[in-house]
């Protein structure tokens, strides 16, 4: 039997097992599973090229593979995710008694960059919204999307997966399904709720909805659920039309939502709950932003700081 073919079959089997492990044991959402499986494909390809079974892979092998991606200038955040995925894969093999120890546990994580998305202020969000022609179905939809992202702090994946049944009008809450299919309840302000209901009743009701898509809130003109990429493109074009010289993505609106809350004295635990952060340390980054804002304000306006 051809050695390469046998190794390929072995890795194909592990690939199926790993995908099942991510879905069932780690309770990962579809987007996360796809990202980790993409990273796994790099490991699989490398191992097959080197004629390595999973149990033959060493720390040195993984370091060489990681160096390859570092030389390609793959972002540190992507490298960290790769390492995280490899660790989960080898951890699965340890559980299955296929290997004794994981070679990935000793990999050094690349330093996480401290770059954060640009923050938009309220006036800039208004400028973005003013670029939409609300007399058109797409314009009214896009205006509403920006309001919901900025007013509720949703991830773009949460927005496009939002269902009609997730809107609790009387309570003024959205039921949001976040990372790992974890549920949380996010307040929605009157303005955002009114815009959403107007869109649903006056715009969405006239869209020829495709089978299976009728449960989703935001649809394209052909009746399909909006994709994340469509929201990215819509916002990018609106920012350019508004003349805003910042790098803006849907995550920037979520980031701006959290920054506004923290800078205006919101309880950090409440912000953590609304954002769906597992760890308070993730939310604490916004307190660091607040300190930077204070420092910059003093530097700009206090006479002793502004002295040369």
Regions found by a protein language model. Give the residues of each.
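Conserved catalytic core of the tyrosine transesterase superfamily
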Residues: 1-308
């Amino acid at each position: 039997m051809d050695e390469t073919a046998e190794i390929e079959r072995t890795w194909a089997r592990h690939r199926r097992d790993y995908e099942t492990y991510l879905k069932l044991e780690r309770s990962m959402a579809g987007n996360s599973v796809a990202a980790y499986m993409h990273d796994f494909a790099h490991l699989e390809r490398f191992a097959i090229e080197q004629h390595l079974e999973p149990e033959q892979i060493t720390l040195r092998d993984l370091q060489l593979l990681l160096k390859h991606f570092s030389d390609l200038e793959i972002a540190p955040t992507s490298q960290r995710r790769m390492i995280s995925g490899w660790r989960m894969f080898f951890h699965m093999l340890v559980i299955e008694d296929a290997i004794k120890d994981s070679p990935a546990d000793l990999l050094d994580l690349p330093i996480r960059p401290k770059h954060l998305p640009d923050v938009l202020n309220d006036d800039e969000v208004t400028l973005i919204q003013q670029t939409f022609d609300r007399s058109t179905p797409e314009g009214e939809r896009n205006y509403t999307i920006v309001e919901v992202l900025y007013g509720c702090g949703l991830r773009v994946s949460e927005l496009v997966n939002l269902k009609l049944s997730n809107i609790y009008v009387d309570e003024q809450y959205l039921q949001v399904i976040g990372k790992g299919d974890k549920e949380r309840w996010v307040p929605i302000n009157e303005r955002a709720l009114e815009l959403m209901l107007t869109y649903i009743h006056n715009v969405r009701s006239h869209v020829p909805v495709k089978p299976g898509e009728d449960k989703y809130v935001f649809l394209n003109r052909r009746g399909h659920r909006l994709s994340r990429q469509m929201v990215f493109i819509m916002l990018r074009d609106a920012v350019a039309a508004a003349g805003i010289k910042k790098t803006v993505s849907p995550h920037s609106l979520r980031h701006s939502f959290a920054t506004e809350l923290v800078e205006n004295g919101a309880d950090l635990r409440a912000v953590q709950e609304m954002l769906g952060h597992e760890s308070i340390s993730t939310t604490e980054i916004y307190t660091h932003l607040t300190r930077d804002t204070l420092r910059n304000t003093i530097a700009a306006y206090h006479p002793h700081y502004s002295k040369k």
